[in-house]
Design a protein with these regions (language model features):
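N-terminal binding-site loop/beta-alpha segment at the start of enzyme catalytic domains
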Residues: 1-68, 83-84, 96
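A short, structured active-site edge motif that brings together acidic residues
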Residues: 65-78, 97-101
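Glycine/proline-rich, positively charged
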Residues: 80-101
Length: 101
């Protein structure tokens, strides 16, 4: 896997799985399959309405969370503050942190 190193030293996998508009079982299986073949960068958003499925795919893959780079995004009018949006996404994904928001 190739990485891009950001100015702060964070390494971001160049190849990522975008999870836009996946349905429940399709989303879970796509995430699990991607991780199985070596993807380590998962990109989702609350706006996609599938963070629960993406999180389930991550958990069911069995991979250690620390080995993944998880990205989520905020829709400008979805939440009162970015902090509330981040907390909501972490709860939906059932993870303790998001690598990039």
């Amino acid at each position: 896997m190739e990485y891009i190193t950001m100015r702060n030293g964070t390494k971001v996998p160049m190849l990522g799985l975008g999870c836009y508009k996946s349905e429940e079982q399709e989303g879970v299986e796509a995430v699990k399959s991607a991780i199985e073949i070596g993807y380590r960068h998962i990109d989702t958003a609350n706006f996609y309405e599938n963070e629960k499925y993406v999180g389930r795919g991550i958990r069911e893959s069995g991979i250690d969370r620390e080995k993944l780079f998880v990205v989520s995004k905020i829709w400008p009018t979805s939440f009162k503050t970015p902090e509330v949006a981040i907390e909501y996404s972490m709860r939906s994904l059932n993870i303790d942190y998001i690598d990039m928001y």
